[in-house]
């Protein structure tokens, strides 16, 4: 029985290790990094900041310079032509080499979004895991 428990434990540890390696392709962004992104000059398109919450959540408050693309629409959106994407979402479709940073309310949906973008072939993904909850709290003191 002990060896069976040990085998299950090893399996769980192995799964945990391998599932966390996917995250290694994604940079974790903190408040300061995102704050600096939000203060970029208007024409600076070096990084795209995407809020993956639903449109009604986005309308209630969002980080400056961010665009809204709900997590449930990311996969189909990224398959649109550049023109159709821009027309539908109001910003230029990121290319695979662009720096893309995602956030949501608490970090869960942004983690899902970063996984989707990675699987679609995007190379430079950032996840602001503190997301809107942290942002709306910390921005008050800035």
Curated annotation (Swiss-Prot):
Keywords: Mitochondrion, Transferase, Transit peptide
Gene Ontology MF: a single term: thiosulfate-cyanide sulfurtransferase activity
EC number: 2.8.1.1
Family matches, as SUPFAM superfamilies: Rhodanese/Cell cycle control phosphatase
Compartment list: Mitochondrion
Keyword Phosphoprotein: no
Major site of localization recorded for this protein: mitochondrion
Superkingdom to which the source organism belongs: Eukaryota
Pfam family for this entry, one: Rhodanese
Catalytic machinery residues: 104 (cysteine persulfide intermediate)
Cellular compartments per GO CC: mitochondrion
Feature: transit peptide: 1-25
Span of domain Rhodanese: 43-140
Catalytic activity, as annotated: thiosulfate + hydrogen cyanide = thiocyanate + sulfite + 2 H(+)
PANTHER family attached to this UniProt entry: THIOSULFATE SULFURTRANSFERASE RDL2, MITOCHONDRIAL-RELATED (PTHR44086), THIOSULFATE SULFURTRANSFERASE_RHODANESE-LIKE DOMAIN-CONTAINING PROTEIN 3 (PTHR44086:SF10)
Known function: Thiosulfate sulfurtransferase which catalyzes the transfer of sulfane sulfur from thiosulfate to cyanide.
Protein name as catalogued: Putative thiosulfate sulfurtransferase, mitochondrial
Native source species: Schizosaccharomyces pombe (strain 972 / ATCC 24843) (Fission yeast)
Phylogenetic placement of the source organism: Eukaryota, Fungi, Dikarya, Ascomycota, Taphrinomycotina
């Amino acid at each position: 029985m002990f060896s069976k428990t040990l085998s299950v434990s090893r399996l769980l540890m192995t799964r945990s290790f391998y599932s966390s390696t996917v995250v290694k392709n994604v940079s974790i962004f903190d408040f300061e990094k995102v704050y600096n992104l939000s203060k970029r000059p208007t024409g600076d398109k070096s990084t795209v900041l995407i809020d993956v919450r639903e449109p009604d959540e986005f309308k209630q408050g969002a980080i400056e310079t961010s665009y809204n693309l709900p997590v449930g629409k990311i996969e189909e959106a990224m398959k649109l032509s550049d023109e159709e994407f821009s027309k539908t979402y109001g910003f230029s479709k990121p290319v695979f080499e662009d720096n893309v940073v995602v956030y949501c309310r608490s970090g869960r949906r942004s983690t899902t979004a970063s996984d989707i973008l990675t699987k679609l072939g995007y190379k430079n993904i950032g996840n602001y895991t503190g997301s809107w909850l942290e942002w709306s709290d910390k921005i008050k003191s800035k």
